[in-house]
Amino acid sequence: MEPVFRPMRRFKQALPEEECFRILTSAYRGFLSVIGDGGYPYTVPINFVFEDGKLYFHCAKEGHKLDALRACDKACFTVLDEPEKEADDWWYHVKSVICFGRVRILSDDADRIPRLIALGKKYFPDDYDTEADVFQNGSRAEMLEFTIDHLSGKAVREK
């Protein structure tokens, strides 16, 4: 039987797990892919927060993404680090992380509320009363927890 997750073909470009975690902590936007209608991939750009080895997203209470996750909890999440350009050259250094895992909808407010607050503070760390907004409006959002089964990171030099 073949392993579920393939090894990276260009293994010399692989990033260590700690670097993958750094990118997941610092990146601001990622792409969540689920198995959508008719078995087609459905990918959406999404804000997220990485805490305690898991990814958290918020979304509306209904829609394509939630329908897909209710049908199949398997998902893929991808982030790109900010590219760095080599001085006086065309080359860019780009790092990316791909996570495979399962997503569950957090239904207990004891789990949901702290994650919504953490997400808000990531994007509005100083100039916004995140906690008040979450307590006032948090019931209008779903909170998703992505448990990572496998991740890999890669550094490439692109021209």
Give short role names for the model-derived ranges.
Residues E2-K12, E84-K159:
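Charged, gly/pro-rich active-site loop segments
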Residues A27-K61, F77-T78:
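Short beta-strand segments
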Residues E17, E62-G63:
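Structural motif corresponding to alpha-helix initiation and N-cap regions
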Residues R29, T43-P45, K74, I98-F100, ...:
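Broad gene-expression machinery/nucleic-acid interaction feature
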Residues H58, H64-W90:
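Helix-adjacent hinge/juxtasegments
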